[in-house]
Amino acid sequence: MERFLENAMYASRWLLAPIYIGLSVALLALTLKFFQEVYHLLPHVLEMAEAELILVLLSMIDMALVGGLLVMVMISGYENFVSQLDIDEGKEKLDWLGKMDSGSLKLKVAASIVAISSIHLLRVFMDAQKIPNDKLLWYVLIHMTFVVSAFVMSYLEKMAKHAH
């Protein structure tokens, strides 16, 4: 009975595979949204104010960062929790493939969240005259919470690796 339960639990890791496939569908949706933004931007780029253009570009950078986060979580999550990727010889292989454990994945996700939050904060500050001061304060506090959390996670991961 114990062996059956252990094998069933181990096999259940494959239930994560459709979730990672779903993330690739989400990446496709993000890509479509990105090019929709490009399509709307190009006809008006010469008549846009510089600040408005920068806001659109920051939005596009934000989408690129979220896309990178999706790829990182999708691939390293699959490798860490489901199965190793069997990439054919001669194909491009990402440098970090097979080297990122769940701890380093958490740190990369935290760093990505801080970067995404930074872009959002920059967009907010570019439009600060339209936003009440109390909301600006909340944006900064939330961003600082992400930053401090990333530092704490990094410190704890370093301490855990040092203890081993």
Swiss-Prot record:
Subcellular location(s) of the protein: Cell membrane
Transmembrane segments: 15-35, 53-73, 103-125, 136-156
Gene Ontology cellular-component annotations: plasma membrane
NCBIfam families in alphabetical order: HI0507 (TIGR00645)
Annotated InterPro entries: UPF0114, UPF0114_bac
Membrane association type: Multi-pass membrane protein
Top-level taxonomy: Bacteria, Pseudomonadati, Pseudomonadota, Gammaproteobacteria, Pseudomonadales
Family: Belongs to the UPF0114 family.
Keywords per UniProt: Cell membrane, Membrane, Transmembrane, Transmembrane helix
Annotated protein name in UniProt: UPF0114 protein Avin_40830
Coiled coil: none
Domain of life: Bacteria
